[in-house]
Regions:
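Extracellular glycan-modifying ectodomains
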Residues: 1-150
Length: 150
């Protein structure tokens, strides 16, 4: 993929308490954890088009920290298709990322290296989104990444 992160000026943000998605489904008193994420001007000014919700959102949806699954703070949670655009990067470099929710916390750190990132979650994507592939305007020489947790 041949890129380097040139901006090391991140602000660390923390949220407590963090329990995770399964907390409400187990009959146990689990000690709270803390969720941490990095941000900067590039991340704060990136636009995220959510195809499922048909709207532009922010990379970090901080209001979602109060949801049952506060991990949804990253790119508004599980969704089939997102297009992230970085107005500060005029390289034209693009990334297509096939992913699960694990990648939602990684993708923000890749934004500064790309003009556009297309994120496809194969668990949720339907043919109605894939039929619109030409609308994504993905370049033929775009980088492609597959990232899944185990």
């Amino acid at each position: 993929m041949n890129f380097e992160s040139s901006n090391t000026n991140y602000t660390l943000k923390k949220y407590y308490p963090f329990y995770g998605a399964l907390y409400g489904k187990v009959a146990s008193n689990i000690k709270a954890d803390e969720i941490e994420y990095l941000t900067n001007d590039v991340i704060n000014n990136a636009s995220v088009y959510n195809y499922e919700k048909n709207r532009v959102e922010k990379v970090y949806m901080e209001d979602y920290l109060k949801n049952v699954d506060s991990y949804d703070v990253f790119l508004s949670g599980a969704t089939p298709l997102l297009i992230i655009e970085n107005k500060f990067n005029d390289s034209g470099k693009e990334l297509v990322m096939f992913r699960d929710s694990f990648a939602s916390s990684l993708a923000p750190l890749l934004i500064e290296s790309y003009s556009k990132i297309v994120m496809v979650d194969l668990r949720y994507v339907s043919s109605k989104y894939l039929e619109k592939i030409n609308e994504f305007s993905v370049k033929e020489n775009a980088d492609v990444m597959f990232i899944y947790s185990t």
